[in-house]
Amino acid sequence: MNSFPWLTIIVVLPIFAGSSIFFFPHRGNKVIRWYTICICLLELLLTTYAFCYHFQLDDPLVQLEQDYKWINIFDFHWRLGIDGLSIGPVLLTGFITTLATLAAWPVTRDSRLFHFLMLAMYSGQIGSFSSRDLLLFFIMWELELIPVYLLLSMWGGKKRLYSATKFILYTAGGSIFLLIGVSGMGLYGSNEPTLNFETSANQSYPVALEILLYFGFFIAYAVKLPIIPLHTWLPDTHGEAHYSTCMLLAGILLKMGAYGLVRINMELLPHAHSIFSPWLMIVGTIQIIYAASTSLGQRNLKKRIAYSSVSHMGFTILGISSITDTGLNGAILQMISHGFIGAALFFLAGTSYDRIRLVYLDEMGGIAIPMPKIFTLFSSFSMASLALPGMSGFVAELVVFFGIITSEKFFLMPKILITFVTAIGMILTPIYSLSMLRQIFYGYKQFNVPNSHFFDSGPRELFVSICIFLPVIGIGIYPDFVFSLSVDKVEAILSNYFYR
């Protein structure tokens, strides 16, 4: 156990440093922005330093572990730790949150509260990914919801209150099932509650109870991931939220659902996961086709990108349900890859809206000529979204396919059928992506508007876009960097399915 509390500092720094924002002058927007960005950069540097010098890549066990007794009466511990499964999402969270803070530069209304909520959300997300205690995981899961609700309801579009209410109803409803699952797992088989992940991983449950616990956790993660039919909050939320909030939602929030599915359902409840995996694979396949088809019919640009996110998360579900090293590594890579690509697409959609004040695709057109930089960036990330070879999405989807084909859990014909149907979904992806590009950038609608003049991408937008584009290309060319983080932990998780 590392004596220095790296993880505690990393988890609490954003929210505690963010609290001091309220002592800043009310009109000091510039100071508040720079302060928030500096906190995010400091947090990212601390995280990177701790992982580079104190994390062993070839060790599947929990590292940087901290365990402090918090509330004696409940035997509740502040228990944190990092392993190969959580290191990728934690680094992704730091990277995307820093860039989302920079993307929020134009926000001037209630600037202190806005930036505090961004930092509070940062703490909740890091805490969720590094928790080693079920109750602490639940608290961090809930802590992250409140800032999203306020960011959406106060800085959203015309229907922001409707979208915020829908978001909180869905997620709070899912959290009830999460709390039931945590309580059931903690109270079973012991006079005292046992909430430690390590203890729960070695606990055997009756099959019926394990299935009930699995289903409870699954509902909570299905809302976040999201899994159809519990996905309808996502397009509305993305359609109304400020694009910096959308970056956090698409880049990190959806990944929390996938992370929970692996961390708790797959690692702690392996028998139930083995029973549910065929159904999960069917749901993932349907989700890819359904969301891709629905995306094509969306007039709203941000809703089209939101449905594309639902479709891409279907590949993560397929990888998790394959119960193979290859498939699960592919699912983790898809989580990281989509975190970058989804955040970038929402950022570019938001910067385009700032200039032309249009969000409906059939009203756009012809802005490639006055805005060539935005056109180039949007085209590049659309290519990444449709899994162009050489970019991260291609490698992730290809590895997931190999995971399905090599899975010993399924017979040959179902594997061929699932691969064939999923391939149709991959064909639909370029259709809605290229159609979106054509409607926004080609034609003459905006170019022929009298006295129209649009500013192209500035240095801030270019910097944010290039910072996201470099990892997309880097992972596409050398995916082994991401695999090296998770491969040993994935083997340890899957050993439960063969030796337990």
UniProtKB/Swiss-Prot annotation:
Provenance organism: Nandina domestica (Heavenly bamboo)
GO cellular component: chloroplast thylakoid membrane
UniProt catalytic activity: a plastoquinone + NADH + (n+1) H(+)(in) = a plastoquinol + NAD(+) + n H(+)(out); a plastoquinone + NADPH + (n+1) H(+)(in) = a plastoquinol + NADP(+) + n H(+)(out)
UniProt-listed HAMAP family: NDH1_NuoM
Designated gene of the protein: ndhD
Keyword vocabulary terms for this entry: Chloroplast, Membrane, NAD, NADP, Plastid, Plastoquinone, Quinone, Thylakoid, Translocase, Transmembrane, Transmembrane helix
Keyword Aminoacyl-tRNA synthetase: no
UniProt-recorded name of the protein: NAD(P)H-quinone oxidoreductase chain 4, chloroplastic
Similarity section: Belongs to the complex I subunit 4 family.
InterPro entries with a match to the protein in the record: NADH_Q_OxRdtase_chain4, NADH_Q_OxRdtase_chainM/4, NADH_UbQ_OxRdtase, ND/Mrp_TM
MF annotations from Gene Ontology: NADH dehydrogenase (ubiquinone) activity; ubiquinone binding
Transmembrane segments: 4-24, 35-55, 87-107, 113-130, 134-154, 167-187, 208-228, 242-262, 272-292, 305-325, 330-350, 386-406, 416-436, 463-483
